[in-house]
Amino acid sequence: MPRHQNYSLSDEAAVQLVFRKYGVKVSAEQIAKAYAPEQKMSWKKSVEVARFIEGMTLRQAKSWLEDVVKMKRPIPIRTFKKKQAHHATPWSGWPVAKWPVKVARRFLDLLENLENNARFRGLDVERVVIVHAAAHKGYRIHNIMPRAFGRATRFDEQTVNVEVIAAELPQQVVPKRYRLNLVKR
């Protein structure tokens, strides 16, 4: 059971974010949100997937994540890439890439929820663009692993709170084809 459900952006802040990124004024009724609290998955991979799908349309993000689950297309790893295998850049110029299948499945469920929320609000799903995606650390589940000779080792499990905010944009602003943004942050 989730302990709390707090979006990091209010409706007014989401409207301002859309105006800053796309130069388009939208109302609060043109924004759809989805939140998945306390998911048992990797926080680092969740951050990379959230950063990657931000700026895509809903259809583009879902098709890319479905390809990740099928192990056809990877997710670029930009921040958490120390001691990772660097490939000979077969994927559009990023040497570090992974296929986070478990995280992609959870994000697909979240995007399905976002699509249903957008339909419920009466938005055109073809013009819905993900304007904000974030993964925050949730609480730790504390476990104990018994060891030999009466000892015990603490075994913690990290949870992740994931949020996605999307807005319906005018047709001329919606990205036709997603261009990979390879700028390092």
From Swiss-Prot:
Protein name: Large ribosomal subunit protein uL22
GO cellular component terms listed in the entry, alphabetical order: cytosolic large ribosomal subunit
Subunit structure: Part of the 50S ribosomal subunit.
Lineage, opening ranks: Archaea, Thermoproteota, Thermoprotei, Thermoproteales, Thermoproteaceae
Pfam families on file: Ribosomal_L22
Family: Belongs to the universal ribosomal protein uL22 family.
Superkingdom of origin organism: Archaea
InterPro entries per the UniProt record, alphabetical: Ribosomal_uL22 (IPR001063), Ribosomal_uL22_euk/arc (IPR005721), Ribosomal_uL22_sf (IPR036394)
Keywords for this protein: Ribonucleoprotein, Ribosomal protein, RNA-binding, rRNA-binding
